[in-house]
Amino acid sequence: MILILFYIILLFEIINGIWCLYRVIRYNNHNNKLTENSNESKLENSKILIVIPCLREQDIIISTLQHFLKLTSNYENIKILVVTTQKEEYEKQKYLYLQDDLKEDVKNNIDIKKMITKYNKILSTMELKDILKLKLNNNIDRIVENKVKNSKTTSKIVEEYIESRKLRDKVYHKHYPNNEGIMADQLNYVLNNFNFIDEGNYYYSVYNADSIPSENTIKEILKTIEKNKQPKVIQQYSAPISNWNNLSAIMKGFAIYQSNFELRYGLINSNIPNRLLYTYVVGHGMYIRVDVLKKIGGFETKYWCEDIYMSYVLRTKNIPICPIKTLELMQSPQYLSILTRQNAVWFKTSFECLKIFKDVFRKNKKINLNSLGWMIQRLRMNMTWFGLPIAFLYTIIVAILNQNIGILTVATLTYLSMILLEYGSIIRLLENTSKIKLGNKFKILLYTTAAATISNIGPIYSLISQKKEKYKTIR
């Protein structure tokens, strides 16, 4: 029985690798046909509101705003809105008591990763790094006190920037007034408090504070709206490689691992419509018509990842996701500890897929093939995410216990073949789509192999920690 399971795992790995390679090849063929048949079209004058929700984004929000202003400078029908939250100010005041601990940790030369995790609610990452540069200064206590005292919230920084540059006709700012809540609450606050005129011709777009969509994004979005006669949902998928050169080897591996998910289940599956394939929207790079968004009840606040819930709702209502080819480049976490917590947040909502299924059923009182297909696929993905590294470990342990170098070699080569077929094809697709050369492919595959082998650290942490509060990814 042990060896039967061993060979079943090996068979699954080979099938998975071949299936992944096949879908990339099919996408490339499909994409080439679209390119050959594409024509320039008149850009529809649909209105777009780009919403950027922020919580402790002091370090990057201005550069992000500058990027979006440049991106939309030629379009009067596109506006930008930053929505901050009172939660940021509330938590800063709540954790000010840590100031004395911070002074001691600076003097004791505590690791920067630990300091960022512990003190991110009272100082930004850049502010903490600035303090560490002066750690040998005799007046370090005063330096810390002044830094904390003069630290500005994201809301304050945004307001000052808009006012000083006279941007109120192009950039709006709304401030979610509650001390609690998650990103979905901020997004719903905008949905309910912004004056959308002609909702069927107005798109509500969401981007993160670290989003860097390319110059071609807006053009392709408007062409997609025109070509598809105002589709209900448009999605720009992403790749976390904007800070590629600042990542360690293992974190580069995880950047490819995450890009694989985005491109395979997002870009590829959305371009090849099939009820058996899993498709999803992401909480950044999404464009959804305001009338549709209001009809489905806005953004779900019961679950930490509102996009997983929305993906299911769209699937049950048979609302297709219209993808664009241009990728959004975003940051990848620089530290494994931060990535683990980020993945734990994603897995928590994913793990609650049966609960989501029941919640939506109570509202709609009906089940269709789309909803069943989504749930089955999500369960399969959860099992793969959590179980594949364990399955590989199982094959290695079985080979060692049997003291059989032959099956150890087969187990290792089968796993590496799966990695090569799955991620080798994705690395090439990622480079072609993003127009960025990532470097030595052999090294990247080694990094990705290491990351894939421990890719269930987030799910494991999620099940063990049982955190009651959503983790905010630290930039």
Regions found by a protein language model. Give the residues of each.
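Juxtamembrane C-terminal module of membrane proteins
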Residues: 19-45, 359-375, 402-475
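Hydrophobic targeting segments
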Residues: 46-53, 65-68, 78-84, 173, ...
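Short, well-formed alpha-helical segments that are part of the catalytic scaffolds
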Residues: 57-70, 90-94
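Active-site-proximal specificity loops/subdomain of glycosyltransferases
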Residues: 92-201
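Short beta-strand-to-loop acidic/aromatic patch adjacent to the donor-nucleotide binding site
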Residues: 198-212
